[in-house]
């Protein structure tokens, strides 16, 4: 993805989860000018020409270390190990400095459900897998956390190389994601876009001042690192697995070290060649929106609930483009003006990012519809939680390395050309990915810091007979099947596999993918088992969301004053305890009286009303809590637009508890005037009635009204 594509794709998540607007604080514009004046970028000298043996300075030594993510990733001793190995920063320059790269090893483990009687003794395969990460710039920790429970570990060790310039592998702009209050928080779209370029230049200036050779951070050197790692680990061959940018690197590695690769799987494919097709992001987005809407139309309930889904959504994007969102900010350290501004890339980027994971698909029409309705009604209160801060680099991307790759791999011309064409073909969707002219500005920054495009011949299409699976998710919004079709002819021994109704990187995210990969790696030349991709079915779409700002209202309150959350929590907590106790007592008491053959003291119908009140209250609180938990599990962004539709019934039950509580209090008072009641009976009835009234009031006060 491009610099501004990544900004657009993650915009909504960035503001909601981590506020990761990128800007390097250590190198401000004035520092940039000084650095350039003091030491202009020089052309390569004769002493820095390519050496005859590119690996002459590689040591091929691996140094064990304690995993940098220990304490942050849950694993037991012996399951995961880490190491560093040293490589030249630029193998084409004889005087290049050395840097260390971080490698994580996820050790193969016996499956918990392994049946030795049926399958025999479990044995680890001796041919490991090297996983090539995406981004470019994605840090290793996120992959470790995800793959530690992936089925691929049921048979083989999995190595994850944290590529040069990322995380613990000599990240030269570790502070890139730190938030600068003045950089991107502006009411002007052009200034907002320019902030991304300023961040890029600040990072490069800082790297230059630290004597970082930015020209060494490219896909070709990355492939050489993988080659060197194989030799350092002592493997004659291993299996290749790469997704997204890892598919680009995978193609380069297939050319770099063909003798060292036993079999390969590349997924979420982008052609290695510098082809403009990849950058038609708006075209790809329109494609998956059409697929989603067509699938929705095939479902009678979805078609009824969400008519004109995409047309309304595009109109919402246009509306925000014309009228950016302005909100009172919560955290004035991050928003010194007290205001926060959101643009159409937020509205466009949220569903785009959700297309990556197929688990989001059932609720995606509901989310798009709710997001659209938010814009139509200009009800942006839920977005205030995005101004509460969080900071840090929540997306585990080393943006400096990403930018260096885009420079050295020569992306800018393709970006400019494809974005201009998308502007003609898809004028609304293209707006969310930025102005095409930014590509020219990016190219100028690249040139100023010695990160010029490498020769195009190094990126020619792969021609190989290595056994390879080329995999795509049909609903991938960023690397769709048409991209894979470009490179398929170069794989003489390749098989193209599509996963219907799957997103970005199905071999990573589909539940049966581990078994699918293991069977392939066990017998690459054998008949391919396609039962996994063939098991993918059209999602069962959920209905409309229950439009409520209740949870975000509470979150905003907590962000503004942590102590203030005590009132609504204690309020609903006490009611929940009373309801739960009452539901048990009023249900079991009649049974106990039957067993004991004792009569009930007359209460004028108060007991039955108390029972109904307790049941309504328990169902309401439990239903809202369950709906919130389900939303978080399926798609946390749903919480910004509402809750699953059925939780509206839970809110109605809570409102019903109000009049039931009032009736219960009246009946209890009436019964006490007619016949003295034991203190325990009276107290139980009065507390249950009061809890019913309190719950109804809580629902009204905190924004959970179902109408």
Where are these regions (language model features)?
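A catalytic-pocket lid/entrance helix-loop region that shapes and gates access to the active site
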Residues: 174-184, 252-316, 351, 372-376, ...
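Conserved acidic catalytic loop of the alpha/beta-hydrolase fold
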Residues: 223-237
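Alpha/beta-hydrolase fold active-site neighborhood
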Residues: 50-54, 315-465, 562-628, 650-653
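Catalytic histidine-centered segment of alpha/beta-hydrolase-like enzymes
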Residues: 502-511
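Catalytic-loop region of hydrolases
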Residues: 25-190, 307-319, 323, 451-454, ...
